[in-house]
């Protein structure tokens, strides 16, 4: 039975209604809550408990699920306007300091500093306090640092959990689990000749046109998700997982800026993107990006890491393919609970299929569950973000200076092998 209090800022928002309450329910079903564990839903709207729960049930149908009514008894609503110190005084009256107290910032980063300050001024930054921060955590290195500085004035790094739901995916978790539990793979890890990390989507920007047009594929997917996967592959495994983030920082700091943009970076935009709702008619935002990246480490010097992400592709794909010397390959499927592992050598082909039959929490539930006992290794450290932004900023500067052209591709009909030929030559 879990014992904690969680305050969810932005409780009436889209993410909370689609993902967060359902994830908390999933944790409740698997592990249970102690009777006095509370979820305090917070928003700007003036709602009674009954009105909020009615809204929540309308959006999620939680009341009709197994033990749903029991779960809902742990939820109450408190109006908190993030720029109103008096509302935080009311919050401090019902918050506790004798068990984990988690504040989930499902709010715009523009409110992070004010919210952190109001929490601290009401003695809500004690040793048991944790902050879970939602992306985007910056638009570049400068703004990433500014966000951290505004929060670190009141909270320590070890109190901050930067959530990247990709790190909670079973397929991504499998990378670490396989490396930890299969010594033979660690021998093969010294023989890697190339790595391909690919996330393709058949969908376009849908209703996110205004938001997406300001960030593009590079910031939306590569800066966080794909570079986090890269770091899990390239890091030296520590003896204690508590040290994993420090090892990932070392890896990300060795990312090399492109020497030749035309041979290492391809960007493109799907035809019709500029006609999407709230997208600028002359937009230069990329919806396709492919990068041939290199690390300056003894083990991976000269080994290409191909990072690929695109929208409006012919198929959905989320995978990592690791190529070894002597034509061995290893492939992870990031969006599935299945691991298909194909190891080949010239004489003894071997196909292994591992199906994990154990129940596994969905990504947000997995990460929320990790935050309760203060497990950080599935959350990014500030220095990981800064190292990734240093690399991403060099690419953004190249885009601004047209170091690589913005190509166009037909929706759902891109010839990938032809399009990516410059990267693989």
Swiss-Prot record:
Disulfide bridge partners, by residue number: none
Pathway: Carbohydrate degradation; pentose phosphate pathway; D-ribulose 5-phosphate from D-glucose 6-phosphate (oxidative stage): step 1/3
Active site positions: 225
Record: residues binding NADP(+): 44, 135
GO CC entries: cytosol
Example GO biological process: pentose-phosphate shunt, oxidative branch
GO MF term set: glucose-6-phosphate dehydrogenase activity; NADP binding
Keywords tagged on the record: Carbohydrate metabolism, Glucose metabolism, NADP, Oxidoreductase
Function: Catalyzes the oxidation of glucose 6-phosphate to 6-phosphogluconolactone.
Name of the protein in question: Glucose-6-phosphate 1-dehydrogenase
Organism: Helicobacter pylori (strain J99 / ATCC 700824)
């Amino acid at each position: 039975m879990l014992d904690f209090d969680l305050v969810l800022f932005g409780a009436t928002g889209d993410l909370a209604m689609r993902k967060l309450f359902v994830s908390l329910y999933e944790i409740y079903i698997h592990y249970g809550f102690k009777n006095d564990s509370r979820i305090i839903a917070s928003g700007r709207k003036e709602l009674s408990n009954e009105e909020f729960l009615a809204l929540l049930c309308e959006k999620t149908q939680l009341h009709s699920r197994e033990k749903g009514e029991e779960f809902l008894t742990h939820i109450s609503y408190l109006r908190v306007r993030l720029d109103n110190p008096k509302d935080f005084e009311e919050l401090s009256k019902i918050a506790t300091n004798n068990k984990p107290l988690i504040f989930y910032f499902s709010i715009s980063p523009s409110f992070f500093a004010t919210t952190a300050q109001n929490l601290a001024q009401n003695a809500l930054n004690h040793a048991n306090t944790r902050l879970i921060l939602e992306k985007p955590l910056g638009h570049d290195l400068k703004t990433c640092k500014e966000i951290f500085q505004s929060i670190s004035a009141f909270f320590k790094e070890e109190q901050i959990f930067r959530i990247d739901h990709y790190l909670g995916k079973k397929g991504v978790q499998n990378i670490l689990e396989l490396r930890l539990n299969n010594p033979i793979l660690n021998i093969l890890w010294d023989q890697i000749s190339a790595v391909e990390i690919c996330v393709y989507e058949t969908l376009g920007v849908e209703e996110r046109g205004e938001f997406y047009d300001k960030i593009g594929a590079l910031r939306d997917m590569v800066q966080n998700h794909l570079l986090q996967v890269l770091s899990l592959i390239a890091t030296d495994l520590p003896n204690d997982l508590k040290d994993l983030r420090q090892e990932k920082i070392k890896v990300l700091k060795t990312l090399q800026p492109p020497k030749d943009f035309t041979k290492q970076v391809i960007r493109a935009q799907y035809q019709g993107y500029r006609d999407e709702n709230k997208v600028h008619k002359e937009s230069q935002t990329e919806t396709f990006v492919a990068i041939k990246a290199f690390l300056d480490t003894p083990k991976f010097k000269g080994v290409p890491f191909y990072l690929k992400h695109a929208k409006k592709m012919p198929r959905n794909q989320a995978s990592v393919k690791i190529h070894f010397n002597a034509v061995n390959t290893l492939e992870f499927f990031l969006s599935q609970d299945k691991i298909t592992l194909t190891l080949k050598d010239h004489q003894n082909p071997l196909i292994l299929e591992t199906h994990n039959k154990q129940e596994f929490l969905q990504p947000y539930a997995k990460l929320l569950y990790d935050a309760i006992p203060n497990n950080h290794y599935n959350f990014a450290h500030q220095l990981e973000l800064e190292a990734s932004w240093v690399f991403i900023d060099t690419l953004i500067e190249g885009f601004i200076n047209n170091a690589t052209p913005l190509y166009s591709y037909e929706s759902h009909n891109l010839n990938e092998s032809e399009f990516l030929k410059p990267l693989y030559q």
